[in-house]
Structures are given as C-alpha cells and as structure tokens.
From Swiss-Prot:
This is GTPase Obg. It is found in: Cytoplasm. Its cofactor is Mg(2+). PANTHER family: DEVELOPMENTALLY REGULATED GTP-BINDING PROTEIN-RELATED, MITOCHONDRIAL RIBOSOME-ASSOCIATED GTPASE 2. Residues 1-161 form the Obg domain. InterPro entries: G_OBG (IPR031167), GTP-bd (IPR006073), GTP-bd_Obg/CgtA (IPR014100), GTP1-OBG_CS (IPR006074), GTP1_OBG_dom (IPR006169), GTP1_OBG_dom_sf (IPR036726), OBG_GTPase (IPR045086), P-loop_NTPase (IPR027417). GO terms for molecular function: GTP binding; GTPase activity; magnesium ion binding. One of its GO terms (cellular component) is cytoplasm.
Amino acid sequence: MRFVDEATITVRAGNGGNGCVSFRREKFVPRGGPDGGDGGDGGSVILRASNRLLSLYDFRLQRNYEAPNGQGGMGSQCHGRKGDDLTVELPVGTQIYEVTEDGETLLCDLSDPETVFVVAQGGRGGKGNEHFKSSTNRAPRFAQKGETGEVRSLRLELKILADAGLLGLPNAGKSTFISKVSAARPKIAAYPFTTLIPNLGVMIDDADPEQRLVIADIPGLIEGAHTGQGLGHRFLKHVERTRFLVHILSVEDVSLDSPDGPWSGFDLINEELVRFDADLGQRVQLQVVNKIDLRDPEDVQALRDRAAADGRTVHFMSALTGEGVEDVVAEMWRMRDELDIHEALVRLRETEEFDEEESDIEVIWVRE
C-alpha cells in the first residue's frame, strides 16, 4: 500500500430546500389559505476516524466531497426531505486544517477511533408561505429560500499512530527488519535513503491473533533533522504518534575505536529527537545493533561486553539472516504489554481521584 500523509480536499454541505408557495384548494373550502410546506435541511459533511484506513492515498484521487441538498417544500403542508449526511472516513491520527486566505486553522485532531466531527454544516430549509400569514396578509405569495450549505477547503495531515516506531541513521536495515516481522514490503537496497516515505507493518501474535502490534518504519534521520535537513521535519512528526521507539543502528556505524564512543550513532539521533520535541527524549526506547553478520563473532562479543560495561541495554541482531530477531520481537511485545498495563493504571488512578472529589452541586430529590 502506498503511504500518503498529506492531502487537500474540498467539502461542500447540501443547501437547504426552498419553502413552498401553495394555497389550499378543496371543495367547499373557497378560501383555504396558505399551506406551503418547509424545505428540508441540507446534508452535512461528517468526518469519522477509522482504523480501517492507514493512508490518505484515496484523498489524492478524490478531492471533492458534496452532501445532498434538502428537498423543496410542497403543498398541503408537506415538508421536503432532509438531505442525507455524507460521512467521510479518515485514518486515525489525521489532523484537519481549514485553508483560507488568511492562512490555516486547526479544526480537529482525529486521534481516537470512531471520533466524529461535523466539518461542514448543511443549510437550513426555508419556511413555506403558511408561516407568513398574518391579520394584514391572509394570502402571502412568498416563501423563504433555503440557506446555502458550508463550503470548506481542508488540508489533511496524517501523523502515524503506531505502537512502535523504527528510527535510526540511513541504511541501518530498518526496512529489512519490518519486512521480516510483518507483511510490509518496503523498498530495500544497499544505499542510504532507500525509504523516502513511512511504511506500516503489523505483527500478529500467533498465540492470540487478536493481539496486534503496529510498526512504523520512519525514513532515516541525519544530523540536523530537527531543522528540516533530510526532510527531518516531515519524518520526525510521525515519531510523535508512536508509543515506544525501536532505535536501530548498523554495526558499520559502531566502533570501539571511535573517539565519540561506540554508541555515538544512538546519541546523535536522540539529540535530534530532543531538539525537535523535548518530550520525545523521554520516550521509551529499545536500542538495537543490526547487520551483525558483517562482523566476526569475536567483534560482536566485544561490543556486547562494552554495552554491559557501559550499563547499556543493547540488542544485537541480523535482520537479513534472522539471528537475534526473535529476541528483539519478544522485547517489543513485552514493552507494548507493559505500556498497556501502565496506561490502564493511569486511567484507573485518574478515575479514583475524580471519584474522591467533593461535588459542589446540591441535588434535591422531589417525590411527585
């Protein structure tokens, strides 16, 4: 599936139906008076967050969305039918901006599944001439026109909502890893910046197929990413919506003889994260050294010993041969489950604190 994280669309709500000018005409009722019905309201455009979608690609193909108009009023006080609302499904994590001549305004953030937002309100139907009769005008020959529905130009921006975000320097083997542990098929080649757009993969627990772990393969980051270098801003925004990070470094970028230390590659990217958003520096992180098949076992063991001496938890694997991959995957599942428990405890604590608060509303019971 091609991943698209930005799109521009136009939404148009339906116009309200016009009120009707009509007079009652029946046998034995020579002066029946006005009986024009009201027009129906126009349909609204509603946005809904859906887990079924993972990209904004469809919105590059269809850019205009229009809800039906309301039906006009009819005689015998018959009201027009309301236009059906148009519901547009968007991926969870989509931010909606209204584009005007003065700039952009954030309207809503569809960060939770099934969140709905009325982005364009349908026009109200006009009133029929029966509403305008009076003591001085017993037979009004006019009715109210329906209101025009709202029209908005929107910019959609998707920030990936994933359990794990894969990040690291270019050519670290992130795409190879996600292709091994999921059904994702990203472009893989032996040169930097092979991945130019984020890729999504889903790991399914064999013991419980209902348990899934969504992985986002973030394109490689370089020094200066927080200032936009190497499309850094465009890639870093996706890191914000991940629950924990899997930081992958190629063994080619790890050297015991480096003056900055063997783990300088990890430190470089972490510094870019902090400069972009201080909260990202506190994100739970799993550090992995990949491509160990390119080094002798003795060299890899020396790196393991150095990590232990530095008090650093580093996993070693080869995504190409599969060595060490199972251990990394097991640790990812453990981190996800641990975060689930932590978030549940936080919600429980918030609920308990809320229950303990004294209400300043006095309730009086009345028996009828």
